[in-house]
Amino acid sequence: MRATTLLSSVVSLALLSKEVLATPPACLLACVAQVGKSSSTCDSLNQVTCYCEHENSAVKKCLDSICPNNDADAAYSAFKSSCSEQNASLGDSSSSASSSASSSSKASSSTKASSSSASSSTKASSSSASSSTKASSSSAAPSSSKASSTESSSSSSSSTKAPSSEESSSTYVSSSKQASSTSEAHSSSAASSTVSQETVSSALPTSTAVISTFSEGSGNVLEAGKSVFIAAVAAMLI
């Protein structure tokens, strides 16, 4: 049964190709039989169209390996002529499978690329949100309240000085007001408190001079009183 099918296949190839009728290459018949045994698509040896469309490369490879001299080219030309007589295109099932596999691998790689870009954009948005949260949480600055409390304590201590230093204390009050109006700048508060300390220290010699003058005046009054008292006692004795 198998021999009858092979014979019918050979006859059909010989009838379909004029070149085969003239010089029938034996290697072409052998290659068709060999490829038909190992083919999973073409299950019959007389299906010329099946070999043309699905086993073209297998037939060509077989012809190049077993046909001597230049018979491989002649045999392949006869095979193509048979395919054109059947209006069959030359193709391969293995090449179509490999092309579909490559297209599926390209699709999977593009899917991976899109998913990785989506994850990277998500990471970027979350990091920007966390950085904005940190920036908003660090916007508070408690240094202004400390500066104002220091200024108030300095001004209260300056009010206990001698009355002769009123001008300097008023100057200190005005400078402390200027410092409190600019309490947002820590360096300006420090500079104004330094000026206030220098003003208070300059007021101290003035109050000391007033106290010493008052002491000298008190001594003169006591001496004058003693002189008057001695004169009165002398007058009474006389």
UniProtKB/Swiss-Prot annotation:
Belongs to the CCW14 family. Glycans are attached at residue 87. This is Covalently-linked cell wall protein 14. GO terms for molecular function: structural constituent of cell wall. A lipid is attached at residue 217 (GPI-anchor amidated glycine). GO terms for cellular component: cell periphery; extracellular region; fungal-type cell wall; mitochondrion; side of membrane. Extensively O-glycosylated. Keywords: Cell wall, Disulfide bond, Glycoprotein, GPI-anchor, Isopeptide bond, Lipoprotein, Membrane, Secreted, Signal, Ubl conjugation.
